[in-house]
């Protein structure tokens, strides 16, 4: 069972902890999909009951992260290091977006961060951007103005990015979730 949607770690942690504990104790595999932006104490509360953290990395430098996400990434990266040190099973998920992070340089920055900090990674998922929700904007009478910015990387680029991880020892790297 994967807790996802919105940000799980920003919900009522008493409820989330009890839900994870109940599911885990009933034998379910519990996964948490997170951006990592939460107090580490909240992660510690649920760590014993979570099988896998699906952990997003969207940008490696503070300025880019703040520009596109709205907050810097210091807490996110620190929490990732702590989760790994505490023995959590982690799948790194990289939403890959042209104009934001779909570059060889960014992928190498992620590889270097993971290696330099001895982050234990079970799997890397490169998630190509999609505009599946584009039609919802018209229903809200809003423009979907992302021309030239928020676009899906080519299949060739995604394969190149995957190979960067594989060549650096992250053999369980996949395109898609």
Predicted regions and their residues:
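Conserved AdoMet/S-adenosylmethionine-binding subsite of the radical SAM
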Residues: 2, 9-138
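A structural motif corresponding to the C-terminal lobe/cap of the Radical SAM core domain
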Residues: 115, 122, 137-164
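Radical SAM enzyme core and accessory elements
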Residues: 170, 174-177
């Amino acid at each position: 069972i994967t807790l996802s949607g919105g940000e799980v770690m920003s919900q009522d942690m008493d409820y989330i902890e009890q839900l994870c504990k109940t599911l885990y104790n009933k034998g379910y595999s519990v996964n948490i999909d997170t951006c990592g932006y939460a107090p580490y104490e909240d992660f510690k509360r649920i760590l014993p009951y979570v099988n896998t953290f699906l952990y997003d990395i969207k940008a490696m430098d503070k300025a880019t992260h703040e520009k596109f996400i709205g907050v810097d990434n210091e807490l996110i990266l620190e929490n990732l290091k702590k989760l790994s040190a505490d023995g959590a099973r982690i799948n790194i998920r990289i939403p890959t977006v042209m104009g934001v992070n779909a570059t060889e340089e960014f992928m190498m920055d992620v590889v270097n961060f993971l290696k330099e900090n001895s982050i234990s990674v079970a799997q890397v998922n490169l998630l190509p951007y999609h505009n599946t929700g584009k039609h919802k904007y018209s229903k809200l009478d809003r423009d979907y103005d992302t021309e030239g910015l928020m676009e899906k990387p080519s299949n060739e680029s995604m394969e190149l990015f995957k190979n960067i991880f594989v060549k650096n020892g992250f053999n369980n790297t996949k395109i898609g979730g």
